[in-house]
Curated annotation (Swiss-Prot):
InterPro entries: AGR/TXD, Thioredoxin-like_sf. Residues 1-20 form the signal peptide. It comes from Xenopus laevis. Belongs to the AGR family. PANTHER family: ANTERIOR GRADIENT PROTEIN 2 HOMOLOG, ANTERIOR GRADIENT PROTEIN-RELATED. It is found in: Secreted; Endoplasmic reticulum. A motif (Homodimer stabilization) lies at residues 34-43, 49-56. GO terms for cellular component: endoplasmic reticulum; extracellular region. Gene3D superfamilies: Glutaredoxin. This is Anterior gradient protein 2-B. One of its GO terms (biological process) is positive regulation of cell-substrate adhesion. One of its GO terms (molecular function) is identical protein binding. Keywords: Endoplasmic reticulum, Secreted, Signal. Its main location: secreted.
Length: 164
């Protein structure tokens, strides 16, 4: 009886191994700092790091405030990532995208909303002179405004003041 049970056990184990299929692991892209806004661009992690690098490298900071669950943010992200001119010009900026509201009161400008894109000069002055097209949310952009954003990016590259 004991040998029959051992044989059944071995048969059961062998059958289990034979029938077992390897479940392929889900391949998912790691979350990068770009969050889909431009995977080939270099992004900083924090607002403070962005300010430091903007000043040190004498480049403007482009801050994108968005939400992962906001349809307007998602649509703008898609347009931003697909616009070749913006992707190329963005290489001239210190780039930061955040899914939270930065605590710097200078970035509040006309309220808290998303998506919002703000430029900060290397002299650490917020470029309030580079709004989007809307009076109620001055620093928001929609996919249809992507060329306006491109023009504002060009203007942001003209620095407010250069140090001697």
């Amino acid at each position: 009886m004991e040998s029959v049970l051992k044989s059944l056990f071995v048969l059961l184990v062998a059958t289990s191994f034979t029938l077992a299929k390897e479940i392929p692991a889900k391949v998912s892209k790691p979350q990068t700092l770009s969050r889909g806004w431009g995977d080939n661009l270099e992004w900083v992690q924090t607002y403070e790091e962005g300010l430091y690098k903007a000043k040190a490298e004498n480049k403007p900071l482009m801050l994108i405030n968005h939400r992962n669950d906001c349809p307007h943010s998602l649509a703008l992200k898609k347009a931003f990532a697909e616009h070749q001119g913006i992707q190329k010009l963005a290489e001239e900026f210190i780039l930061l995208n955040v899914v939270y509201d930065p605590t710097d009161k200078n970035l509040q400008l006309d309220g808290q909303y998303v998506p919002k894109i703000i430029f900060v000069d290397p002299s650490l002055v917020v470029r309030a002179d580079l709004p989007g097209k809307y009076s109620n949310h001055q620093y928001t952009y929609e996919p249809a405004d992507i060329d306006h954003l491109f023009e504002n990016m060009k203007k942001a590259l003209v620095l407010l003041k250069t140090e001697l």
